[in-house]
Structure formats: structure tokens, C-alpha cells
Design a protein with these regions (language model features):
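Amphipathic, Lys/Arg-enriched alpha-helical "gate/interface" segment within cytosolic domains
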Residues: 1-157
Length: 157
């Protein structure tokens, strides 16, 4: 998997892009990174699940474990705001996993309100973005890559 975390300071929005085969270790690394950077947690996040994203190695039981992991990481932060996290899937394959994740109580456990949207327009409306800002998200314009999570390359013997 590759999980790419980007930020646009101008519109104060995080963009988290999921592509390829998703592994539990990368998801845990994303959670830890966010918990270690509370300054970025004050902003909304647009989670974009690319068409090639493959969650087949992740069971719902693993997602339950991840949610508990997030809860333990975020609970001590005691965020004073509710941030928004929108999810947009470019294909149907990961939608069951995203829907399961969003069925958890993120508001109480992570100070986050969440929504699964079906288009950039719907996501932008929910995040209260202007048309110009929506275009920036669609083109990844103004977003600077902060960190990339990907598996280590296999080493030869």
C-alpha cells in the first residue's frame, strides 16, 4: 500500500490518499503519525480511496482493532473541536470497509464527525468548500506531501 498524507495550508485541509494493497501496519503508522502531530488534527481531512486501493487483506475484526488503536491514541489529546473527515471511494470494492469504519463512534472516541460521500461535489459541500477549493482538491493543487507510508522493499538474499 501507499498512503500519502498531504496538506494545503491555504484552505487548511488535509488530504489522505489510499492506493494499492492496504496493510494493517500502514494504517497503524498513519494513526500514530496523526496522534503525534496534534497541530494537524485541528483541520478537516479528505480521505481519498483510489480505484486501485485493495482492502481485501483487512478484516472487519482488524478494523475493530484499528478503531480501538485510534481511540487509545486520540483520547488523551482531548481535542476541543470536532473535526470533519470525509471519505470518497473511486471504486465500489473498498466501500464495505469504509462503511464499516464509519459505523464506529468517531465523534465520541476521536472528536471527529465523518461522512462517506459519492462525489467530489458532495464531499466539498459537506466540508463547506467553495467551488474553487473543490477544484484544488480534485487536482491536488496546493497540497504538499507531508509523509508517505509504504511497505519496505523486499531485500534480496
Amino acid at each position: 500500500v501507499t498512503v500519502i498524507f498531504r496538506r494545503n495550508e491555504e484552505i487548511e485541509l488535509n488530504l489522505c490518499e489510499f492506493t494499492g494493497a492496504i496493510a494493517l501496519d500502514e494504517l497503524k503508522a498513519v494513526a500514530k503519525y496523526q496522534a503525534d502531530k496534534p497541530d494537524i488534527l485541528g483541520s478537516d481531512t479528505f480521505n481519498l480511496v483510489r480505484a486501485d486501493a485493495d482492502f481485501s487483506a483487512i478484516t472487519f475484526s482488524m478494523l475493530d482493532q484499528m478503531f480501538e488503536h485510534y481511540r487509545r491514541l486520540f483520547m488523551p489529546l482531548r481535542l476541543q473541536i470536532f473535526r470533519r473527515a470525509v471519505w470518497l471511494c473511486e471504486s465500489d470494492a473498498p466501500k464495505a470497509h469504509v462503511a464499516y469504519w464509519l459505523s464506529q463512534d468517531a465523534k465520541e472516541n476521536m472528536s471527529t464527525t465523518v461522512k462517506h460521500c459519492h462525489s467530489f461535489a458532495e464531499a466539498a459541500d459537506w466540508l463547506l468548500l467553495t467551488d474553487a477549493e473543490r477544484g484544488m482538491v480534485e487536482r491536488c493543487e496546493g497540497f504538499v506531501e507531508i509523509i508517505r507510508f509504504q511497505p519496505e522493499p523486499a531485500r534480496g538474499l
